[in-house]
Amino acid sequence: MLKAVILIGGPQKGTRFRPLSFEVPKPLFPVAGVPMIQHHIEACAQVPGMQEILLIGFYQPDEPLTQFLEAAQQEFNLPVRYLQEFAPLGTGGGLYHFRDQILAGSPEAFFVLNADVCSDFPLSAMLEAHRRQRHPFLLLGTTANRTQSLNYGCIVENPQTHEVLHYVEKPSTFISDIINCGIYLFSPEALKPLRDVFQRNQQDGQLEDSPGLWPGAGTIRLEQDVFSALAGQGQIYVHLTDGIWSQIKSAGSALYASRLYLSRYQDTHPERLAKHTPGGPRIRGNVYIHPTAKVAPSAVLGPNVSIGKGVTVGEGVRLRESIVLHGATLQEHTCVLHSIVGWGSTVGRWARVEGTPNDPNPNDPRARMDSESLFKDGKLLPAITILGCRVRIPAEVLILNSIVLPHKELSRSFTNQIIL
């Protein structure tokens, strides 16, 4: 028997995802047509022996999250439950706090997945590796170039046994080109080191004259408190993958992740990809169109376009490398490139909404998405354009490399600006 835990964080996280995270929790943001964590759940549900999927985070269990859980249980015929932390507990604190729920039924092992990663999730291969070794911790790793590796947790492995000999989270100097993917497979014994960290935190933080538990003791960071401490002790191993992988920290990385998932649909979900039909819009490359969307026959879509529920796309519209969210309207002859159009937004006739992609270097097979910074030397850096919820763009204007916060009605063109 197996279980899976998806760490979804909380509203104090995902600030780089604004203004998109104003409307829905970041883990529910649509990537390639479905909520971000649905890709995780689909992968977990395909592992033989999977009995339960647990979501752990600090979000309030509001209506969108509750509806998603109900729909996921029906679609995958698996218990999918949300466990809310009493406070933000870090990447390992929630695992220890809810250890009884995780270990209920005596699972052989349990997967732990961070919500903000895009991957092909080689979970079955990880399970095979785990069953050969039977060690407490198995990490999924991939490679990055020397410069970008400093932005991730870096792993030094024994190339023969794949034991993790050294682990450093975001080192200041080059350690290794093997990086942590944020996807793990733990044995039940893996919770014992978390207990040790909790007890040590309790001893360090407790004052002599303050009875009871120190509230900060429950905060446990898997990367710094567990992986770094146990590396080289024969407990942590790494499974390397050369499949797709990317973090989803910002809106720009969500657009890149959408492209990766759309390309995977050719093998995993070909029914989700739109096809050119007589009397329908022209489709170029991988495109997702929700069944309720209305798209004019003269529109040209793709590559790498995702169109959400209830979207209206008018005559002569050109869409490329973009996400158009629920209820948005693109009027006649608009052009949307490298952008995200928010829920219920309207782009007027002959308007142009365009951003600048921040993709990995295509000439470097180990390149990853750079950590996006909005500003450099006091200037807004070119990036994808984001229209927040219910933004109105008038006809015949240009919105270039800009971020428009929700409920704004513009009257002119903007370039390289954040419109508050």
UniProtKB/Swiss-Prot annotation:
Cellular component aspect of the GO annotation: cytoplasm; GDP-mannose pyrophosphorylase complex
Keyword Secreted: no
Single GO MF descriptor: transferase activity
Binding site for GDP-alpha-D-mannose: E85, Q247
SUPFAM superfamilies in the cross-refs: Nucleotide-diphospho-sugar transferases
Residue span of region Hexapeptide repeat domain: 273-420
Subcellular location: Cytoplasm
Region (C-loop): 356-384
Matches recorded under PROSITE patterns: HEXAPEP_TRANSFERASES (PS00101)
Domain notes: The N-terminal substrate-binding domain adopts a Rossman-like fold and has a binding pocket for GTP or GDP-alpha-D-mannose.
Protein name (Swiss-Prot/TrEMBL): Mannose-1-phosphate guanylyltransferase regulatory subunit alpha
